[in-house]
Amino acid sequence: MARYIFITGGVVSSLGKGLASAALGALLQARGYKVRLRKLDPYLNLDPGTMSPYQHGEVFVTDDGAETDLDLGHYERFTGRPATRQDNITTGRIYQDILTKERRGDYLGATIQVIPHVTNAIKDFILDGNDGYDFVLCEIGGTVGDIEGLPFFEAIRQIKNDLPRGHAVYVHLTLLPFIPSAGELKTKPTQHSVKELRSIGIQPDILLCRTDRTIPAEERRKLGLFCNVRESAVIEARDADNIYAVPEVYHAAGLDDEVLAAFGLEAPAPDLRSWHEINARVHNPEGQVTIAIVGKYTGMKDAYKSLIEALSHGGIANKVKVKLDWIESEVFENEDAAPFLEHVDGILVPGGFGQRGAEGKIKAAQFARERHVPYFGICFGMQMAVIEAARNLVGIPSANSTEFGPTSEPLVGLMTEWLRGNELEKRSRAGDLGGTMRLGAYPAALKRGSRVSGIYGGALEISERHRHRYEVNTAYKDRLEQHGLRFSGLSPDGVLPEIVEYEDHPWFIGVQYHPELKSRPFEPHPLFASFIQAAVVQSRLV
């Protein structure tokens, strides 16, 4: 029977509960346990798919097509276990399910209430499908005291009572702020956070205290006394210089030992050699490359979380440090791109939606093509590269995307149908935004002898995760290929372009999918490893 670890947060938001959950999962996995990580989000949206990147950050897409919280990306990268739509739930989805059942008459006329109906739905979600796992780690979004989180806290309170003794542990992540004028760490915010938790019936077993310095023995004793936990269960969560150092930092602080002690379990010491190797490469690079990310949400780095990590993985694979130069694509829409891009070793244009900044991305693709600078276009970045080729190579000055409005030359258009397996999926042009994209893992057939096939080890078919409504128009394929832009990857039915590349360019690849979603520190995605390798070569030429 699985044991459950509930991770909650207090004092302030954005403390890193997702990263802490992922690191703890990795430590338990390194001890030989099988783990599952899940995220419970208290907001009323059905999923983050239609939420602004500036508010929510990245939407992480799973193989089965779920649009989920970015923390699931941390879970996958740290444990290697692919997440599914069953690993993320929101209040919106829970209410939708309950109201659907109510309309159907499933509740037989009962009055629908938060307790027991909402809390039971949350409990059912948490407990479902966990056979075969030793530990299930559940992160509760938000902070203790948030009104929307109360049903989730009540549900996990009940679960501990429902399970056999010793099968649930509460870990509370909190902040110990340092006050320079007083010269000391302050424990009072944590005491109040735990007091709030205890007022709703939850006594944390372990305090994971974020801090930038050592916790003095007196403060540790005070936290243990007033928060009603053992002093050994007050874990010092020191800031780390990179996220892949967190598992080793938390192990050194005793987090995994204390979790196992709370369950009354003993286990072999964790095998952290692979994590040690990753950190050795991060701390001892043999060079550095500069990559320009020409995006439209650069003011919110969390909008590109998986992309940042995938580039880091490419650097790890090549034993180099990857320096990121964030460039808002609007800045050179009406200017020459060269002054902004001449110093970089590679250009990456990521995904995005809408017309804002599109012309700047097209200019970035043109600069990379003409100057022979490595270029990686992802999703929207591929589409803009194709439009650039149509305008400046094929001679179609009005080439554009129908996403931006009516155009006489629709190089990129809205997909209204596509295949998933043997079934045809369709969408109305007037449909809602939510859930209307081509989402999840789809296969792509690669051309034999193409650069991209070589990067994938000679593979002729791959599977990658997608998130897009618009697609390059194959009606222009022959004309583009006549001018050197090769369509080296298509959907198996030959209808949807998946990959384009220039044969006479050091490294210029555009992909319609999101390879960053499948990159891991121990298994860097081959496209990112190859892109950074090309940037290393470019750095020696500049």
Curated annotation (Swiss-Prot):
Q: What Gene Ontology terms for biological process does this UniProt record contain?
A: 'de novo' CTP biosynthetic process; pyrimidine nucleobase biosynthetic process
What's a single GO CC term here?
cytosol
Explain what switches its activity on or off, per the activity regulation comment: Allosterically activated by GTP, when glutamine is the substrate; GTP has no effect on the reaction when ammonia is the substrate. The allosteric effector GTP functions by stabilizing the protein conformation that binds the tetrahedral intermediate(s) formed during glutamine hydrolysis. Inhibited by the product CTP, via allosteric rather than competitive inhibition.
Which InterPro entries does this one have? Class_I_gatase-like (IPR029062), CTP_synthase (IPR004468), CTP_synthase_N (IPR017456), GATASE (IPR017926), GATase1_CTP_Synthase (IPR033828), P-loop_NTPase (IPR027417)
Amidoligase domain: region residues: 1-265
> Residues that bind Mg(2+), according to the entry?
71, 139
Query: What are the UniProt keywords, alphabetically?
Result: ATP-binding, Glutamine amidotransferase, Ligase, Magnesium, Metal-binding, Nucleotide-binding, Pyrimidine biosynthesis
Task: State the EC number(s).
Answer: 6.3.4.2
Task: Indicate which residues the UniProt annotation says bind UTP.
Answer: 13, 186-191, 222
- Give the binding site residues for CTP: 13, 146-148, 186-191, 222
Pathway per the UniProt entry: Pyrimidine metabolism; CTP biosynthesis via de novo pathway; CTP from UDP: step 2/2
Provide the binding site for L-glutamine. 54, 352, 380-383, 403, 469
Disulfide bond residue pairs: none
Q: Where does ATP bind?
A: 14-19, 71, 238-240
Q: Where is the Glutamine amidotransferase type-1 domain?
A: 290-541
Q: Name one GO molecular function term.
A: ATP binding
Q: Which HAMAP family match?
A: PyrG
Q: Please give the function described in this protein's UniProt entry.
A: Catalyzes the ATP-dependent amination of UTP to CTP with either L-glutamine or ammonia as the source of nitrogen. Regulates intracellular CTP levels through interactions with the four ribonucleotide triphosphates.
Self-association or partners: how does it assemble?
Homotetramer.
Question: What NCBIfam families does this protein's entry cite?
Answer: PRK05380.1, PyrG
Q: Which family does it belong to?
A: Belongs to the CTP synthase family.
Tell me which PANTHER family the record gives.
CTP SYNTHASE, CTP SYNTHASE-RELATED
Q: What is this protein called?
A: CTP synthase
Source species, please?
Nitrobacter hamburgensis (strain DSM 10229 / NCIMB 13809 / X14)
